[in-house]
């Protein structure tokens, strides 16, 4: 199966992505993660105003196959969460890089994502799995 790897995103080896626009980060999970999870049935996300710390858990995603922790690629404060996904978590599967985003975060340091995986590095990791 062929997956999409947007070039303007950075990736964690745990399959979360981050896209930075100024000081705002959009966070979600990759198309590969969606494929591996299968049918998504539950999503737990932090509240607006909650603090995230890079590398630490910020929520949970549950599918018919597994329950996975979600890891933050950035440190900052949640300014928006995708409420539509709380009620209909299966929508993540339809458009993980677009309408299936999880959180928008005001980041403390936009440069901290520089050591996250590039699209090419992430692709190499996924194709090696």
Swiss-Prot record:
One of its GO terms (cellular component) is glycine cleavage complex. It comes from the Bacteria. Residues 24-106 form the Lipoyl-binding domain. Keywords: Lipoyl. Binds 1 lipoyl cofactor covalently. The keyword Nucleus does not apply. InterPro entries: 2-oxoA_DH_lipoyl-BS, Biotin_lipoyl, GCV_H, GCV_H/Fam206, GCV_H_sub, Single_hybrid_motif. The modification N6-lipoyllysine is found at residue 65. GO terms for biological process: glycine decarboxylation via glycine cleavage system. Its cofactor is (R)-lipoate. The keyword Oxidoreductase does not apply. Belongs to the GcvH family. The glycine cleavage system catalyzes the degradation of glycine. The H protein shuttles the methylamine group of glycine from the P protein to the T protein. The glycine cleavage system is composed of four proteins: P, T, L and H. This is Glycine cleavage system H protein. It comes from Nostoc punctiforme (strain ATCC 29133 / PCC 73102). The gene is gcvH.
